[in-house]
Every structure is written in structure tokens, then in C-alpha cells.
């Protein structure tokens, strides 16, 4: 008998992966956590039936959420990561010797524990001495912080369930306050393709625009996320990622599977239908 993992992207669209075995299934105080093993995508884990990370394509997401802001401002030293319980975002950040401190705030400790056991590919740098783990609500955490971070990365789940509060005007305003005068905020911005995800994307973009003077959106192709077309938000008090001297990033000699400085320039060139959505967020 064949075992398939099937995820509902809309009420009329489903995405399936053939599974060899289910490695873990459990429920925390916040969500259901499942880990599967597959031939095509390796080990992958889901939260409440939604894909979070696969061994095969996680490099795309983590490259793009980390290296775009790091190339824009190579002097980043103090970073806050909200969410990111799989550890992949922290893994990429620890590759920068110039970063002195990484605070990671994850609401669900069980996510981290499960990923440490089943996804060492992403979780293998959570014990880096520069990393401090806080198992609490990121929304509450940023309320008490002011003028502290050079970069905040919001590596959250979708804008419903435990991650819902990370898409509010209050949250983005508190992130602005928590950043230094030249600080950068990057967040996963959902997909523009399916209607429900596009609504979440437009709502997030509208609220970020109300807080930050520099506000851009960039994209990547992530095969296991709904539609495969995924967006990221880039907001800053000072730096425009299209005007920064990003070629200096190449001097670091970091080996990446997805990100490069040519792609950095190109990923901000959006399709017309996405441009129109972003232009009309106030309607």
C-alpha cells in the first residue's frame, strides 16, 4: 500500500508527496507537528497539515530570507529571529563571523526539539554560542525592546493559528521600535497566486508600508510551498536593497546553493500581476 502526504492549497487544489514512512506525529499546546520521510524531498515536517521545511528545497527559503538583508548591510551585528523553529535561518546567519548576537524567539519549544532530532540539516547551529533561544510569543517579546537590533527576520508560519499575531500593524510597529536607526526587517510574505494567500500578502505589505520608509518585495521559487511562487518583504529605516553595494558580499567567499548577487538584483523584479496587487493594497 502506498502512503501519500496530501496538503490542501485551496478547496480545489491539492499537493501530494509519496511518503516512505511517518517518523513523528505529536501535538503541542499550539499546533500539530508531523515529520515524514520521502524519496523525492527527503525528510520534511509540517505544522497543522501545512508544509514548513523539506531537506531538498529548504536551502532556497533560508538563502533568500537571510542573504538578501546581509548583502544589503554587511555591518549587521545584532539579529532577532522570530519563529524559525527548524533552525535553518539561524544556520545561515551563523555563517557570518561579523554577527555577534542572534536572539531567536520561538513560541513552540516542541518544534525546536523535533527538528533537532529529525532535521539536523537545519537545526545543527542552534547551539552556536552567539545564539540565545527564547521560547515565548514573539509579539510580546518585541514590545519590550527598543533600538537594539540591526536586523529582524520574521520567519513565521502563515497568518492564521499561532503565527497570526505576527502579521498585525502593532507587531510591525514594535519591530520598527526594536530596530536601530538603520535597521532592516525581513519577513516571509506568503504567495501572491492563490486568493487566500494573496490576501495575507497584501495585508502584511499594507501594514509594513505604514511603518517603514523603505518597503520592497522580492520573490523566489519554492517547489513545496503553495503555487511554488513565494514572496518576501524587505523593510528598512535606511537601506534600499536595490541601491546597496551588494558586490562586497562576494568578498566573504560564502558558498550558497541559491543566492547570488545577480539574483539579488533580479528577485525584486516582480510580475505585473504582483505589482498591481502591491500598488492596490490601500484599496
Curated annotation (Swiss-Prot):
- Which pathway does it serve? Amine and polyamine biosynthesis; spermidine biosynthesis; spermidine from putrescine: step 1/1
Tell me the domain of life: Bacteria
- Gene Ontology molecular function: spermidine synthase activity
Keywords on record? Cytoplasm, Polyamine biosynthesis, Spermidine biosynthesis, Transferase
Q: Does the keyword Cytoplasm apply?
A: yes
Q: Which InterPro entries match?
A: PABS, SAM-dependent_MTases_sf, Spermi_synthase, Spermidine_synt_N, Spermidine_synt_N_sf
Describe, as the record does, how this protein assembles with itself and its partners: Homodimer or homotetramer.
Q: GO annotations under biological process?
A: spermidine biosynthetic process
Q: Name one GO cellular component term.
A: cytosol
Gene name, please? speE
Substrates-to-products reaction catalysed:
S-adenosyl 3-(methylsulfanyl)propylamine + putrescine = S-methyl-5'-thioadenosine + spermidine + H(+)
Query: Which parts form a coiled-coil structure per UniProt?
Result: none
Query: What's this protein's name?
Result: Polyamine aminopropyltransferase
**Localization, UniProt:** Cytoplasm
Alphabetized NCBIfam families for the sequence: PRK00811.1 (NF002010), speE (TIGR00417)
Query: Which intervals hold domain PABS?
Result: 2-237
Q: Give the species this sequence originates from.
A: Clostridium perfringens (strain 13 / Type A)
Might you give the EC number(s) for this enzyme?
2.5.1.16
Question: Which of this chain's residues are annotated to bind S-methyl-5'-thioadenosine?
Answer: 31, 106, 137-138, 162
